[in-house]
């Protein structure tokens, strides 16, 4: 993405900020969440909601695409069973948003929603989506925008917990290519990004071992991976809090 786009679209999505502009964005965000939550509480037919979200996810207007990503996040929280049932459609829309060619806000919202959705489905049945998500997330670890880097580290750490046997070889290669980024951002200029990086580094450390005698995977690391999975499924917001406060 060129510098002009980043100047226009990459202005602080920041991790927390108290600027007046953020308050206006938060207000719009609040009403958006309420709107989608009411739809699910009224039990509006899911196919209708998915149709609306699918249309908005591909709309030329970036604000509508952003709303679609947010709506999918609300769906994951309010109707996780439905998301599991229609996960291929949901994942397809989120990956589409993750690769948005213009809007950093759409990409950011997609990453946050993917963190919730992957937790609800416990990383099962991702198929080739695992590759798509991993490749794009890895490129965002070095993004100049603090919020994008933060969300990318959270999501990448989650992917480490869900790689499993099927994607172990692929993910090991991705982690090795990411090693420099992991080391650099341990000292990230943004303290919250640095904390998220440290937690993700621990989650990825088993994939960095070269020989058995240099294994990073202690008994504590194995317990942490199980804990990542449980929190990711039941309380993704707590998982993000732990990342932010270096509790794991």
Curated annotation (Swiss-Prot):
* InterPro entries recorded: ARM-like (IPR011989), ARM-type_fold (IPR016024), HEAT_Maestro (IPR055406), Maestro_heat-like_prot (IPR045206)
User: Which controlled-vocabulary keywords does the entry list?
Assistant: Nucleus, Repeat
Q: Name one Pfam family in it.
A: HEAT_MROH2B_C
Task: Decide whether keyword Repeat is in the record.
Answer: yes
What superkingdom does the record give?
Eukaryota
Gene3D superfamilies from the UniProt entry = Leucine-rich Repeat Variant
Q: Chief location of this protein?
A: nucleus
Q: In which compartments does the protein localize? A: Nucleus, Nucleolus
What is the protein named?
Protein maestro
Name the source organism. Answer: Macaca fascicularis
